[in-house]
C-alpha cells in the first residue's frame, strides 16, 4: 500500500510503474515543463524542480521503497535534492552509455593538446633565447670589425691582430657549436609535456579497454554460460531490446546504439568467418571494415573543415554588420550588410555543423575503442575456442539488436527537442 502518490501523480505514472516507465515519464514531463520551453510562465521553474525531485526519489529503488511506506519526508536523498537543471543534464548527458563505450575523451583531449603544444612551443622558444644569450659573440664581433676595417682600407695595418681574432673566433664558434649539440641531445632525451600527456592517455585508454572488455564478457555470459538453446537466445535478445529502447532516448542515443551495433556485428562476423575455409573467410569482411574506418576518418575531417569554414563566414558577417563604412565586393558593387535575423540563422547553422563535427569525432573515438574491446574479448587465450565462438555469436546477436533499434515519429520529435535542450544546458554551463 502506497501512503503518498504525489510523486507518481507528478510524473503521470501508476504506483506499479517499472523503473523504465518512470524514467520515460520523467523525460517526457521534464521536456514539457522545462523553463526554456515556457519562458513566459513564472511557475515553470518550480514545476520543473518538483518533477526532478519526484524522479530522484522514484528513480532510486531504496528511496522509492521508503516513499511508498512512509511518505516524502522519509524519502529525501542523503545529500539533499540536486538542482533540477543539473539533474536533467546528468541523467541525459550520455552517461548511460559509459559501461559500453567508457568516457569520451577526444574533444577534451584536443583542447588539452592545444594547450600543452602552446606551452611546449613557448618553452622551446625560451630555451633557444637562453642558448643564444649564453653563446659568446666574439666571432660575430670580429667578423663585423673585419668587415668595417676592410671597408675603411685598414686591413694591412691590422693584419696580425685580425689573424689572432679570427683564430680566437673560430675556437669560440666551435665551442659554441659543441655546446649547442649537447643541448640538442638533452632536448631529445627530455620529453615534452605533450608527449608525456599522449603517453598517459595511451595508458588510460588501455585501462578503459580492459574494463570495458570485462563488462562486455559479463553481458555476453548471460547467453554464453546458459543452456544456449533458442529460448535462452530469445531471452537474451528481449533483455537487450528493452535496454536499447531506453538508451535510444538518450542524447544522440540512437546514433550511439547503431555505432555500437555496427562494430559488434562487424567484429563478430569477421571472427566467425575466419573459423571457416582455413581462416580465409574473414579476409573479405576485414577489408570491408578497413574501408569503413577510412570513410569514418574522411567524414570526421570533412565535418571539422565544414564547421571551420562556417565559423569563418560567420565572423565575416559579424564584422560586416558592425562596420560603419560601406562594403564593396571585388567588382566594386556595394554589399548589403547582414541583418540580425541573418546572423542568427548563420549562428544556428554553425551550431548544427559544430554538433555534427563533434558527433563524427565522438563516433570515431567510440568505434576505435570498441574495436579494441572486441579484439580483446574474441582473442582471449584463457578460454576455449568453443567459448570464443559462443562469445562471437552472442556479440553478433547483440549487434543485431542495437542495429535494428529505431525511434517512432513521436519519439524522434521528442528526442530532437530534448537534444536541443541538452545542448543549450551545456552551453549555459560553460558560460557560468
UniProtKB/Swiss-Prot annotation:
SMART domains: DnaJ (SM00271). InterPro entries: DnaJ_domain, DnaJ_domain_CS, DnaJ_X, J_dom_sf, Peroxisomal_DnaJ. Interacts with SLN1. This is DnaJ-like protein 1. One of its GO terms (biological process) is protein insertion into mitochondrial outer membrane. Its main location: cytoplasm. Keywords: Chaperone, Cytoplasm.
